[in-house]
Amino acid sequence: MSNLSGKVQTVLGPVDPEQLGKTLTHEHLTMSFECCYHPPPAGDEAVAESPFQMQHMYWLRQNPYSCHENLLLLQETLAVREELLAYRKAGGGAVVENTTTGIQRDLPTLRQLSKDTGVHIIAGAGYYVDCTHTEDTRRMSVEKLSDVIVSEVLHGADGTDIRCGVIGEIGTCWPITDSERKVLKATAHAQSQLGCPVIIHPGRNPAAPAEVVRILQEAGGDISKTVMSHLDRTIFDEGELLEFAKLGSYLEYDLFGMEMLNYPYNSEVDMPSDSQRVKALAFLVKEGYEDKIVVAHDIHTKNRLTKFGGHGYSHILKNIVPKMLRRGISQRQVDKILVDNPKEWLTFK
């Protein structure tokens, strides 16, 4: 294991885990999501290409991936800075920034945002989904990919001395591609060397999370130090959810604030409401998984920032926590979900 044992690695350096406080485990502060642009519905092309206007905000909430400008969160650093200050004022302490190679990770900006706001920011190492892999990435062996990931954690990424504190979000599709499978194996190898946290973006199929776990386990990964993201858009059946929970990963509900009628990446998915997400958390708590739940918003488009009428990074603290308490989740359990579980996950072995 690395000499980071017992520490959390932020963009400003290692810190004691007790310093983190309330932590959002899956956010983006600066990124491009143009890799996943989806054409607008027929007849809506003019709206999709027009400048942001208040009259179009509802359309953007329903079609966030069909407007090129909306996918460029990296253009809104000043707005994100103000959001982080508001998040800290609301009681937030840390954010895990999940932008990896392929979607324009910007470590110097993350470092500056942390300095400016006092929010601990943990950056992600590794690679996103297959469509963002370069030919060089595809040609790399598992060993070489692992070496790159380890270096991003121990020495710094993207030509900087800014070190990542988590591997991920590691992107996978459904079915998992050959290139993604190599990255998963490399992730497991790197994790076994470093004793570090890992976070996964699973494909949009109920079987995807368990298949990822199987690949990681067979390659030597530590599932107890791994977060499975996006469960709120992936596993809907309670029985299937409990079967997956038994595998031992952290269970992340990370699309709070995102409510849409039609999910373009999988038309079979009915995106849940925030009330349904809270209901799922209460179910998992009742079933004994309060020590394995983490939450976030996964903000990755402009329209979800408060600047553009969105919910922002403080939504969970201001709006979801009171709802959790009203739905039978105790304050102690809320504290586990927001403070203790992220702290345990992020601490290097």
From Swiss-Prot:
Cofactor note: Binds 2 divalent metal cations per subunit.
Alphabetical list of CDD domains matching this protein: PTE
Localization (cell): Cytoplasm, Cytosol
Biological processes per GO annotation: catabolic process; regulation of appetite; taurine metabolic process
Residues that, per the record, bind a divalent metal cation 2: 169, 201, 230
E.C. no: 3.1.-.-
Residues the record lists as binding a divalent metal cation 1: 26, 28, 169, 298
Keywords from the named record: Cytoplasm, Hydrolase, Metal-binding
InterPro entries in the cross-refs: AryldialkylPase_Zn-BS, Metal_Hydrolase, Phosphotriesterase
GO MF annotation list: N-acetyltaurine hydrolase activity; zinc ion binding
Cofactor(s) listed in the protein's UniProt record: a divalent metal cation
Catalysed conversion reaction: N-acetyltaurine + H2O = taurine + acetate; N-propanoyltaurine + H2O = propanoate + taurine; N-acetyl-L-methionine + H2O = L-methionine + acetate; N-acetyl-L-isoleucine + H2O = L-isoleucine + acetate
Subcellular location, principal: cytoplasm
Gene Ontology cellular component list: cytosol
General function of this protein: N-acetyltaurine hydrolase that catalyzes the hydrolysis of N-acetyltaurine into taurine and acetate. PTER also acts on other N-acetyl amino acids (Met, Ile, Leu, Val) and N-propionyltaurine, but at lower rates.
PANTHER family assigned to the protein according to its UniProt record, in alphabetical order: PHOSPHOTRIESTERASE-RELATED (PTHR10819), PHOSPHOTRIESTERASE-RELATED PROTEIN (PTHR10819:SF3)
Family: Belongs to the metallo-dependent hydrolases superfamily. Phosphotriesterase family.
Protein name: N-acetyltaurine hydrolase
Source species of the chain: Tetraodon nigroviridis (Spotted green pufferfish)
